[in-house]
Swiss-Prot record:
Stated name of the protein: Cyclin-A3-1
GO CC terms in record: cyclin-dependent protein kinase holoenzyme complex; cytoplasm; nucleus
Superkingdom of this protein's organism: Eukaryota
Family (UniProt): Belongs to the cyclin family. Cyclin AB subfamily.
Chain's gene name: CYCA3-1
GO molecular function: cyclin-dependent protein serine/threonine kinase regulator activity
Species in which this protein is naturally found: Oryza sativa subsp. japonica (Rice)
InterPro entries, sorted: Cyclin, Cyclin-like_dom, Cyclin-like_sf, Cyclin_C-dom, Cyclin_N, Cyclins_cyclin-box
Ranges for region Disordered: 50-80
Amino acid sequence: MAGKENAAAAQPRLTRAAAKRAAAVTAVAVAAKRKRVALSELPTLSNNNAVVLKPQPAPRGGKRAASHAAEPKKPAPPPAPAVVVVVDDDEEGEGDPQLCAPYASDINSYLRSMEVQAKRRPAADYIETVQVDVTANMRGILVDWLVEVAEEYKLVSDTLYLTVSYIDRFLSAKSINRQKLQLLGVSAMLIASKYEEISPPNVEDFCYITDNTYMKQEVVKMERDILNVLKFEMGNPTTKTFLRMFIRSSQEDDKYPSLPLEFMCSYLAELSLLEYGCVRLLPSVVAASVVFVARLTLDSDTNPWSKKLQEVTGYRASELKDCITCIHDLQLNRKGSSLMAIRDKYKQHRFKGVSTLLPPVEIPASYFEDLNE
């Protein structure tokens, strides 16, 4: 098994970022309409099975909106709250209906109860106990590729997190061979897109993105299998769910500018998706640890944990130490991973280049001590 993986890993990996760098060196114009990404690292997939990233189709609602342009406008209903946060009893929280201040405590309690339900949790050791032909390395390669797919189709981040959750839960219950792993990935993303997106990509888009390696019927069948195995329990909270709740509390002073902190948290949270070792951790634990490491990166001279964060997250820094260490190691790439999609994504200017920022090599032990009351 290890030999096959090493042989596959030795094959040249053609990603969008790599293609862009090659184009810059050779000064060869690359057509912008058809960008290709390879998933060749999956054993048994040859370099001929390149993945074509198809430009996102125009929103389906465009024509409908135009046809009714002349009709008199009706008062729009108040927007549904898109962000769940924990709000203090202050004037700012009470005055903003988007923050759901009256219900924040109930929402938080409900999400905490959901995340610990066995039916919504993957097995901590499914690679060792359930899978025969799939390894943790293959899982990481698949997730890295799905990050690029989500970027190409401009999917919201919740879709990516749900996709990985579905994959882990499915693999915890059913063994599959490596040839079906990419099929599982696109089918899981198809389901997550239907759950989260306003205009999700259709089945044909996901077939095309695999260079038609799989037929429409195969994707639909795998979609059905996923739904049945997961018993149609598709709405579980993810790391992103809790991250939204914790970020506002971590912006309690001007030391942590709003956008850099938010982007840094998003970057670290996506890195955690690559790590099989994070599967065993609760989403709220990962989210709290991500906030700790993000604040440490942006200001290493100040204890990144605070009484307010401890109260909002429900965790002391000492309780998060193992997860914080894991996230910290991922950020420093201490395992020497070659999976670069997330790092390249967050190098972009629109994300403030947060992936180029590094935390201190060692986290001071004093930062894990209990805070004084």
